[in-house]
Amino acid sequence: DPIIEQARSALSAHYRDELGETFRTVGMCLYRGGQDSVAWHGDRFGRGATHDTMVAIVSIGAPRALLLRPRNGGPSIRHVVGHGDLLVMGGSCQRTWDHCVPKTSASGPRISMQFRTRGVR
């Protein structure tokens, strides 16, 4: 899709100095409503298990909360991600923090586009 490719190219250009590489893949999640959710996890597969990485998330649609908490315990931090927002998880975030999108009583559809570099899942 040309719009997704434009977003990938723009994000790659913006973060190239920090990343040292381009974003290679984009994954998409459709949240049909408030009952669709993602459990606590960290993207620690591939290089993300041992290296600092970056995931750039573009949100389209209804606002949803994204929670972050330290992997070894501690209070969570709540971010509401709205239509057109960009959330970047970089550095050691994937190895040292978990994140989730909890269920909610009121929410419309949302698409989350996650841009990743080579070997990050």
What are these regions, as identified by a protein language model?
Residues D1-R121:
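Non-heme Fe(II) oxygenase metal-center motifs and adjacent flexible, charged/small-residue loops
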